[in-house]
Amino acid sequence: MNRVGFVGWRGMVGSVLMQRMQEEHDFKEFDSTFFSTSQTGNAAPFFSGSQSTLKDAHDIKELAAMNIILSCQGGDYTSDIYPKLRDSGWQGHWIDAASSLRMEKDAVIILDPLNSDLIQEAYKKGNKNWIGGNCTVSLMLLALDGLFKKDLIEWISSMTYQAASGAGAQNMRELISQMGNVYNHAKDLIDDPKASILDIDRNVSSTLKSQDFPIDNFGVPLAGSLIPWIDKDLNNGQSKEEWKGSAETNKILGRENNPIVIEGLCVRIGAMRCHSQALTIKLKKNISLEEINQTISSANQWVKLIPNEREISMKELSPAAVTGKLSIPIGRIRKLNMGPEYISAFTVGDQLLWGAAEPLRRILRILIKSI
């Protein structure tokens, strides 16, 4: 039976992955070994039904005993350990949530509902590096799967509304702390029916600008505000997160030599774990709205078409409605006044499920069946 090693399984993405693997009874398909960077020798989790101890995640010999390693430990760990492991002669499969290896020539960005053919072709050629994609990219691709498969898209402008979870667990905690801080400072005024809303607004504004406001992780207030920049500055006016939209999409689809133009701005908002995207799409030809909706809704089992109506859009197209779900709703689809080939759409997806853990879980199942 194949031996699979897990690193970073206690973190945010790793924890969601473990939960999904238990729900789908994945652990019965292989022998599991759990690694740790800080608690070597402690009891390992009981997910696989057998008791063991945690192995050292920096021990190349222990890692090399695995047929497959799945890491959610982050880019620094990958950059340190992966080359050492390959240099030791290890020929196993490396699955990774981090972005470090995504754009390497010998790496496949995994999203099997869209690129299963590319995955199978790479496997037959001996590829052994399988990397999870950027969260907003994966969610957008799944939502627009049908349009991509029929090669109907000329270009996309994507304006994102990204949750705190994309920045990490400590950022999620800080967002809640910021929310609590704002409320605590304004509570007396909120409870006073005679208090002016302008007084409450001034109180909130003052709190957000206070030197004591918790911003260690975000650097600026997110609660009651937003952050119009995500990831590194590429020194060309574009953030790295925005660059990923085009670069990773075209690699996932195998279109590096014939890329679809994808541009836009990435913005952090005060949601916890679901990313939203407002899309402007230019199609290659004028097709009916009915055909567009049918193409989108029938593409895969996770996309959920929401009628472009006020009440159901408000109910179904929000982070509050989608958190914890594998379904990816897409709505607000209509023809734009710019011309018959232009359409709008709005989509929401759980950043920790299809945006992170689920592609990793599924490629592991694919490899286990193939090896």
What are these regions (language model features)?
Residues I69, A164-I371:
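Charged docking surfaces used in two-component/phosphorelay signaling
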